[in-house]
From Swiss-Prot:
One of the record's GO cellular component terms: plasma membrane-derived thylakoid membrane
Domain of life: Bacteria
Source organism phylogeny: Bacteria, Bacillati, Cyanobacteriota, Cyanophyceae, Nostocales
Organism of provenance: Nostoc sp. (strain PCC 7120 / SAG 25.82 / UTEX 2576)
Regions that span the bilayer: 92-112, 142-162
SUPFAM superfamilies: Photosystem I reaction center subunit XI, PsaL
Localization (cell): Cellular thylakoid membrane
Protein name: Photosystem I reaction center subunit XI
Coiled coil: none
């Protein structure tokens, strides 16, 4: 086995000797690397379809979508894994915990918006960053929509979890 590895070092046609990591755009001054993962069409498609990078969305719509997702998935760990998981009102505790964390995230976003953040740079994965995050107003719109969406997502998760028996009875 060691012989095969040693012998492959001298064969340029061996796939193990091909470079797969390059500087982005073949320019080492960018300070970014183009790998088979971040340069693949599937990863580029996925990243560019996330709400933060999808073209044509306003900052408010971006914040609403991101907030709904965060509020929805933050509810579960607070309700089902928190210290009140065995209590009768575990779902309410999960709702309040998720809303509290969304409020803290919104405060952090507002602080970041008021710190004059740098403009987004083009990268291998996102060659055209959106204009939504170029101004303080865009970031503040994103933060306020994040709060609304986050609370809404947590309330939807609370409603679905609290009324699971009713929903199962309606569906089947």
């Amino acid at each position: 086995m060691a012989q095969a590895v040693d012998a492959s070092k001298n064969l340029p046609s061996d796939p193990r000797n091909r470079e797969v990591v390059f500087p982005a755009g073949r320019d080492p001054q960018w300070g970014n690397l183009e790998t088979p993962v971040n340069a693949s069409p599937l990863v580029k498609w996925f990243i560019n379809n996330l709400p933060a990078y999808r073209p044509g969305l306003t900052p408010f719509r971006r914040g609403l979508e991101v907030g709904m997702a965060h509020g929805y998935f933050l509810f579960g760990p607070f309700a089902k894994l928190g210290p009140l998981r065995d209590a009768a009102n575990a779902n309410l505790a999960g709702l309040l915990g998720a809303i509290g964390l969304v409020v803290l995230f919104t405060l952090a976003l507002s602080l970041y918006a008021n710190s004059n953040p740098p403009t987004a740079l083009a990268s291998v994965t996102v060659p055209n960053p959106p204009d939504a995050f170029q101004s303080k107003e865009g970031w503040n719109n994103f933060a306020s929509a994040f709060l609304i969406g986050g609370i809404g997502g947590a309330v939807v998760a609370y409603f679905l979890t609290s009324n699971l028996a009713l929903i199962q009875g309606l569906v089947g």
